[in-house]
Curated annotation (Swiss-Prot):
SUPFAM superfamilies given in the database record: EF-G C-terminal domain-like (SSF54980), P-loop containing nucleoside triphosphate hydrolases (SSF52540), Ribosomal protein S5 domain 2-like (SSF54211), Translation proteins (SSF50447)
GO biological process: ribosome disassembly
Domain tr-type G intervals: 8-290
Organism for this UniProt entry: Shewanella frigidimarina (strain NCIMB 400)
InterPro entries membership: EFG_II, EFG_III, EFG_III/V, EFG_IV, EFG_V, EFG_V-like, EFTu-like_2, G_TR_CS
Gene3D superfamilies assigned to the protein according to its UniProt record, in alphabetical order: 3.30.230.10, 3.30.70.240, Elongation Factor G (Translational Gtpase), domain 3, P-loop containing nucleotide triphosphate hydrolases, Translation factors
Subcellular location: Cytoplasm
Binding-site positions, GTP: 17-24, 88-92, 142-145
A Pfam family that the UniProt record links to this protein: EFG_III
Purpose of the protein: Catalyzes the GTP-dependent ribosomal translocation step during translation elongation. During this step, the ribosome changes from the pre-translocational (PRE) to the post-translocational (POST) state as the newly formed A-site-bound peptidyl-tRNA and P-site-bound deacylated tRNA move to the P and E sites, respectively. Catalyzes the coordinated movement of the two tRNA molecules, the mRNA and conformational changes in the ribosome.
UniProt protein name: Elongation factor G 1
């Protein structure tokens, strides 16, 4: 079966934004104009096509990013048919993991901002994630019909708060209830979408007289931005004072793909104005899979290899999302980087080092699907029938094994205990939690050794609320939920060398394990590193993994207060063994004892998670808000002016002090202040607090 759409006509894009910028409505309009959905689903009615989990329809927020394939030929049918794969991503801060995961497999993104609230804290997070993965992007300033909408202000915020070179390619005609349409600053024409057919048709008109001067000035800025793409264009522009439409578009495309500029459009998805032009901009300015650098990976001999977007290259794909579907079981969403995968074919999971077989391949339209015979380089689809695949695993050709870079996922910061309500719920709960953890790497499940309680940990209270909710709905598990607990951690601050010795020799077969360990702190976020420095076989090779295992078990159980130890390097540099009495168990215990003893000598400290908190409050309550944050051991990092006399307070506050903050803030401000928080970093807990926690845990 040959390729139906040439790869240069593919666009793999994400629609990203913070909560309530109108991203899902925008995606809905995209599906409508591309002819895939015949009746527009409204988020207000709980009927949007991409929000297909019941909780999303109730809460009006998007939780799982559904991948949707659509086709577009342009507003004036000016293009050959392009295939646009859209990944709708959640904007709530507890789901940043989903956003991170989507950006990893996209070639470009459309970032949606609200015309009245502009750049919000969550927008900054998303923007930083897109920077990290070098994702070229376009901006769509939505909700231009809302009270307080101001295109220029949002553009300035993007320039100042996000540090981006933002080049508008449109200008709004009117705003708030007078929002009429947009001016195309490349063609220098006004676009007027029809109100009678939901914006399916439009007319070009002359630019309104009152906007002519401003449009001319913005057109000039845009052409200058295009001219900077090359010396030849700049010379032509300086000589002739103008560039052709094709030259402008080609140059802006090149600079967008190089992440030098960000083009901005505006409109109102809800009022059916502007989304069609965003689709044209996606085709005109965002990259096809062949326009971005080939993905690099590591082969079996640890050499770096590239996988070009080519059907003839060996097959390589990344699993970026696992979803459980009540009808077909597990769906593994994959982005194919190179080669071809046929349904029914075998693949190799290079991270788990296992061979698997793909049963069927389906292409998802928000909530229905078409079966495919095969997928090729550049495709995004879902595979059915894979047994043991986790988010971030690489699937590849068994004869050309490669590991594409893994995604790094943040440590969870909040833990709650869950108990099944009845014996029948007990078994179901285990299965449900296992499935949910496979879907979401930022969610962890463990059993507390002492209390035998099941503990679930995640990125915030909303994250865990939704997990508990999904257990009830999708798996029919009723459970009681405990009070949230802070996920403290431990680490060390100095370097030590320490002996770990486990000897039991009293007649018959004994136990003998003896190691010398060097334990030292690593920088924050580095994780655990084990170094084998044994020379001359003083500890036999077959016992070394056991030492590593013993150390890791002790790290998991902590040394101060039973919390996991982070960011240490342990080097095994000496030891001894007994011909008869040494075995794996003895060396495992020796490693564990050595680590515990050493960590207690290496200035151990208790770490607490600190959150980046941003409070939006009317000026009258500013004093109370700041005073309250100080009382919660918060460090105020700065204050900004928002719109209409509203102040923004930026602070860093320990998570343990933030429980119940929503209620306190509401009552302190009569419900007029709001806040958002996200995990920032682990820091040393103050001595008095650490002491109290350690005492209560021991």
């Amino acid at each position: 079966m040959a390729r139906t759409t040439p790869i240069e006509r593919y666009r793999n894009i994400g629609i990203v934004a913070h909560v309530d910028a109108g991203k899902t409505t925008t995606t809905e309009r995209v599906l409508f104009y591309t002819g895939m959905s015949h009746k527009i689903g409204e988020v207000h009615d709980g009927a949007a096509t991409t929000d297909w989990m019941v909780q999303e329809q109730e809460r009006g927020i998007t939780i799982t990013s559904a991948a949707v394939t659509t086709f577009w030929r342009g507003m004036e049918a000016q293009f050959a048919e392009h295939r646009i794969n859209i990944i709708d991503t959640p904007g709530h801060v507890d789901f940043t993991i989903e956003v991170e995961r989507s950006l990893r497999v996209l070639d470009g993104a459309v970032v949606v901002f609200c015309g009245s609230s502009g750049v919000e804290p969550q927008s900054e997070t998303v923007w930083r994630q897109a920077d990290k993965y070098h994702v070229p992007r376009l901006v769509f300033v939505n909700k231009m019909d809302r009270a307080g909408a101001d295109f220029d202000r949002v553009i300035n915020q993007i320039r100042n708060r996000l540090g981006a070179t933002c080049v508008p390619i449109q200008l709004n005609i009117g705003a708030e209830e007078n929002f009429k349409g947009v001016i195309d600053l490349i063609k220098m024409k006004a676009i007027n979408w029809s109100e009678t057919d939901q914006g399916m048709t439009f007319t070009y008109e002359d630019i309104p007289a009152n906007l002519a001067a401003k449009a001319a000035e913005m057109h000039e800025y845009l052409v200058e931005a295009a001219a900077e793409a090359s010396d030849e264009l700049m010379n032509k522009y300086l000589e002739e004072g103008e560039l052709s439409e094709v030259e402008i578009k080609t140059a802006l495309r090149q600079r967008t793909i190089n992440n030098e500029i960000v083009l901005a459009t505006c409109g109102s998805a809800f009022k059916n104005k502007g989304v069609q032009a965003v689709l044209d901009a996606v085709v005109d300015f965002l990259p096809a899979p062949i326009d971005v650098p080939a993905i690099t990976g590591i082969d079996e001999s640890e050499n770096e290899v590239k996988r070009p977007p080519d059907d003839n290259a060996p097959f390589a794909a990344l699993a970026f999302k696992i979803a459980t579907d009540p009808f077909v079981g597990t769906l593994t969403f994959i982005r194919v980087y190179s080669g071809v995968l046929e349904s029914g074919a075998g693949v190799y999971n290079s991270v788990k080092q296992k061979r698997e077989r793909v049963g069927r391949i389906v292409q998802m339209h928000a909530n229905d699907r078409t079966e495919l015979k095969e997928v090729r380089a550049g495709d995004i689809a879902a595979a059915i029938g894979l047994k043991d695949v986790t988010t971030g695993d690489t699937l590849c050709d068994n004869n050309h094994r490669v590991i594409l870079e893994r995604m790094d996922f943040p440590e969870p910061v909040i833990t709650i205990a869950v108990e099944p309500r009845s014996k029948a719920d007990q078994d179901k709960m285990g299965i449900a939690l296992q499935k949910l953890a496979a879907e979401d790497p930022s969610f962890k499940v463990e059993t507390d050794e002492e209390s035998a309680q099941t503990l679930i940990s995640g990125m915030g209270e909303l994250h865990l609320d939704i997990i508990v909710d999904r257990m009830r709905r999708e798996f029919g598990v009723e459970c009681n939920v405990g009070k949230p607990q802070v996920a403290y951690r431990e680490t060390i601050r100095s370097k030590v060398e320490v002996e770990g010795k486990f000897v039991r020799q009293s007649g018959g077969r004994g136990q003998f394990g003896h190691v010398w360990l060097r334990i030292e702190p690593l920088e924050e976020g580095a994780g655990y590193e084990f170094v084998n420095e044994i020379v001359g076989g003083v500890v036999p090779r077959e016992f070394i993994p056991a030492v590593d295992k013993g150390i890791q078990e002790q790290m998991k159980n902590g040394v101060l207060a039973g919390y996991p130890v982070l960011d240490v390097r342990v080097s095994l540099f000496d030891g001894s063994y007994h011909d008869v009495d040494s075995n794996e168990m003895a060396f495992k215990i020796a490693g564990s004892m050595g680590f515990k003893k050493g960590a207690l000598e290496a200035t151990p400290v208790l770490l607490e998670p600190c959150m980046k908190v941003e409070v939006t409050t009317p000026e009258d309550y500013m004093g109370d808000v700041v005073g309250d944050l100080n009382r919660r051991r918060g460090i105020i990092e700065g204050m900004d002016d928002g719109i209409a006399g509203v102040k923004l307070v930026h602070a860093v506050v320990p998570l343990s002090e933030m429980f119940g903050y929503a209620t306190d803030l509401r009552s302190a401000s009569q419900g007029r202040a709001s806040y958002s928080m996200e995990f920032l970093k682990y820091t040393d807990a103050p001595q008095n607090i650490a002491k109290a926690i350690i005492e209560s845990r021991n």
